[in-house]
Structure formats: C-alpha cells, structure tokens
Swiss-Prot record:
PROSITE patterns cross-referenced by the UniProt entry: ACYLPHOSPHATASE_2, ACYLPHOSPHATASE_3
Hydrolase recorded as keyword: yes
EC code: 3.6.1.7
Keyword vocabulary terms for this entry: Hydrolase
InterPro entries named among the record's database cross-references: Acylphosphatase, Acylphosphatase-like_dom, Acylphosphatase-like_dom_sf, Acylphosphatase_CS
Identification of the protein by name: Acylphosphatase
Provenance organism: Rhodopseudomonas palustris (strain BisA53)
Disulfide linkage: none
Domain of life according to the entry: Bacteria
Active site: R17, N35
Gene: acyP
Length: 96
C-alpha cells in the first residue's frame, strides 16, 4: 500500500517531520516527508496496509506541539518513492 498524506494546521515548526520520520522508521515503512511552502506537511508512506494505516493515525495526532486541523490521504504511485535519497528507506526532504 502506498499513500500520499497531507497534514494542515499547526504542523510546521513543531517537530512534525522528525516525528513522522521516527514513527515511520519504527513501523518499517518506506517513503519521505517534507514541508510545503503553503504551511502543510506532506508525506509518502509505503508498506503493509496495517502499518501504513497506523502511520496515518499517528499523523492525525502528530507530536504534542502540533495541531492537525485537516488530513488528506490518497493513493500514490510507486514512482513517487524515487524522491527519497539514495540508500534511504525513509527520507526527510527539502521544502517545496
């Protein structure tokens, strides 16, 4: 299962990307996370459906300083995994 997830609200400047990277690594997911200039955080998760769904649930909550006002998720294409840094299973990417 591969899902593209976008979180909106107080999700930048609160450790959200580090939270996502830590949790996704713990769930043995592949993918990436990045800030967007519009103030949202975007992440791609790839792995077993139960692990991806658990990660999406964690994103709805976020780290303690965050407030997720909205979360959207959609199917993603495997080609989007190419955005990861070479040799990494899960990458924190630059802001777009």
């Amino acid at each position: 299962m591969i899902r593209l997830v976008t979180m909106r609200g107080r999700v930048q400047g609160v450790g959200f990307r580090a939270f996502v990277e830590f949790q996704a690594t713990g769930l043995d997911l592949e993918g990436w996370v990045r800030n967007r200039r519009d103030g949202s955080v975007e992440a791609l998760f790839s792995g077993p459906a139960d692990a991806v769904e658990a990660m999406i649930a964690l994103c709805r909550q976020g780290p303690s300083a965050a407030h997720v006002a909205a979360l959207a998720d959609e199917e993603a294409h495997p080609d989007q995994l190419r955005l990861r840094r070479a040799g990494e299973r899960f990458s924190g990417l630059p802001t777009v």
